[in-house]
């Protein structure tokens, strides 16, 4: 579960990590009132879970009430990389002299958590990692002992953080690790961590991803789950109990089993397509569950075709076929082309059940993916 910026900053503030004064607003009038209360200049920031909000027009710095009204009116209601903006965070602007990056995640290759520090904050850290990996200092942590203060200071100094703020940066890094461990986070980061001219450090942005399987241990975070859903589709996925990730392409993908879905994503990319989503219907899926999956994918306006990749083990091919037929028979006209590949338990029965007036059936995964990619290209 990925928290919104305002939610993550609330968690940070409760842990004692400095964050700018801010107020959440859902109307233009609320945004202007919040800006007046905080005092100008303020930043008005779209609360949607996408990167590059600033470049896409989702973050604006304003100097007065008129500018605040104009910015809030422009941002509220906009579609930002496919997500509808219905809330903004009105936040005190930070006058900074430097931008840093700090974060904690799991290094699966090392089998340990890793804390990271860089003086290249305020930019896409993935690009920094690719172009100049030495610009990010990594410090592995033994989870049995936690992060020692000396490790955090070592990472800050090795990264080249100014001595005047190195101890404060190290303290925040230690707090981030403690949050990462205590809240069962999978990733936590601040980018940028701003340094002011009077040597204060402030978390100007916040990213926090929580292991959904551990939410039962955190009632405070569980309460945030509905609001944390990035859009209506993700909220619907939670309701249906699907593992779903929205992507930026136009070929919808439905499968049973994470590995099978990932393989399908890779093949869509291999054959020149762009995946629109990751959707795993799980094992033993009945007709209703399959119909719900199709309803979800069709609800994404970016989808131009859909490919089903089902391998029957617990999930029976005939049940899947019934679900596909039931879902498609609800439409007077099929919204988008659907390609189906069935294999395994009762696959032959399933292919006989499928209404070929509604779907295209392919025997191999490669053929199914190529057909779906072709359909998506033709729909554009």
From Swiss-Prot:
Instruction: Name the pathway it acts in.
Output: Carbohydrate metabolism; tricarboxylic acid cycle; succinate from succinyl-CoA (ligase route): step 1/1
Q: What's an example of a GO molecular-function annotation for this chain?
A: succinate-CoA ligase (GDP-forming) activity
- What Gene3D superfamilies does the entry give? ATP-grasp fold, A domain (3.30.1490.20), ATP-grasp fold, B domain (3.30.470.20), Succinyl-CoA synthetase domains (3.40.50.261)
SUPFAM superfamilies, per this entry? Glutathione synthetase ATP-binding domain-like, Succinyl-CoA synthetase domains
Does the record carry Magnesium as a key word?
Answer: yes
UniProtKB keywords: ATP-binding, Ligase, Magnesium, Metal-binding, Nucleotide-binding, Tricarboxylic acid cycle
Binding-site positions, Mg(2+)? 191, 205
Q: Can you quote the record's cofactor note?
A: Binds 1 Mg(2+) ion per subunit.
Domain ATP-grasp, by residue range, is 9-236
* Matching InterPro entries: ATP-grasp (IPR011761), ATP-grasp_succ-CoA_synth-type (IPR013650), ATP_grasp_subdomain_1 (IPR013815), Succ-CoA_synthase_bsu_CS (IPR017866), SUCC_ACL_C (IPR005811), Succ_CoA_ligase-like_bsu (IPR005809), Succinyl-CoA_synth-like (IPR016102)
Q: Which of this chain's residues are annotated to bind ATP?
A: 45, 52-54, 91, 94, 99
Subunit structure of this chain's protein: Heterotetramer of two alpha and two beta subunits.
| Functional note | Succinyl-CoA synthetase functions in the citric acid cycle (TCA), coupling the hydrolysis of succinyl-CoA to the synthesis of either ATP or GTP and thus represents the only step of substrate-level phosphorylation in the TCA. The beta subunit provides nucleotide specificity of the enzyme and binds the substrate succinate, while the binding sites for coenzyme A and phosphate are found in the alpha subunit.
| Cited PANTHER family | SUCCINATE--COA LIGASE [GDP-FORMING] SUBUNIT BETA, MITOCHONDRIAL (PTHR11815:SF10), SUCCINYL-COA SYNTHETASE BETA CHAIN (PTHR11815)
| Protein name listed in UniProt | Succinate--CoA ligase [ADP-forming] subunit beta
Q: Which organism is it from?
A: Natronomonas pharaonis (strain ATCC 35678 / DSM 2160 / CIP 103997 / JCM 8858 / NBRC 14720 / NCIMB 2260 / Gabara)
- Gene designation per UniProt: sucC
């Amino acid at each position: 579960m990925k928290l919104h910026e305002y939610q993550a900053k609330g968690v940070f503030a409760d842990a004692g990590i400095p964050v700018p004064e801010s107020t959440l607003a859902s109307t233009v009038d609320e945004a202007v009132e919040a800006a007046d209360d905080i005092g100008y200049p303020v930043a008005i920031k779209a609360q949607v879970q996408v990167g590059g909000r600033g470049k896409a027009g989702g973050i604006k710095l304003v100097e007065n009430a008129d500018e605040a009204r104009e910015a809030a009116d422009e941002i509220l209601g906009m579609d930002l990389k496919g997500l509808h903006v219905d809330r903004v965070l009105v936040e005190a602007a930070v006058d900074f002299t430097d931008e840093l990056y700090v974060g904690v995640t799991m290094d699966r290759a090392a089998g340990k958590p890793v804390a990271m520090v860089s003086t290249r904050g305020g930019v896409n850290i993935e690009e920094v990692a690719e172009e100049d990996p030495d610009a990010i200092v990594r410090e592995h942590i033994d989870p049995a002992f936690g992060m020692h203060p000396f490790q955090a200071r070592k990472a800050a100094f090795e990264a080249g953080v100014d001595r005047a703020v190195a101890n404060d940066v190290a303290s925040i890094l230690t707090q981030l690790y403690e949050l990462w461990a205590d809240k069962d986070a999978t990733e936590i980061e601040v980018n940028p961590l701003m340094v002011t001219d009077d040597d204060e450090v402030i978390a100007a942005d916040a990213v926090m991803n929580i292991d959904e399987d551990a939410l039962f241990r955190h009632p405070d975070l569980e309460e945030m789950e509905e609001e944390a859903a990035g859009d209506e589709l993700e909220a619907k996925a939670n309701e249906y109990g699907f593992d779903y990730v929205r992507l930026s392409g136009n070929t919808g993908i439905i499968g049973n089993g994470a590995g099978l879905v990932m393989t399908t994503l890779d093949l869509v990319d291999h054959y020149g397509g762009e995946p629109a989503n990751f959707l795993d219907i799980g094992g033993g899926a009945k007709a209703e569950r399959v119909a719900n999956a199709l309803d979800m994918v069709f609800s994404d306006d970016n989808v131009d075709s859909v490919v089903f990749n089902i391998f029957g083990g617990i999930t029976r091919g005939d049940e899947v076929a019934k679900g596909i037929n039931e879902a498609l028979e609800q439409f007077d006209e099929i919204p988008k082309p659907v390609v189906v590949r069935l294999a395994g338990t009762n696959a032959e029965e399933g292919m006989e059940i499928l209404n070929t007036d509604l779907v295209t059936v392919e025997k191999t995964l490669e053929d199914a993916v190529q057909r779906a990619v072709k359909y998506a290209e033709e729909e554009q």
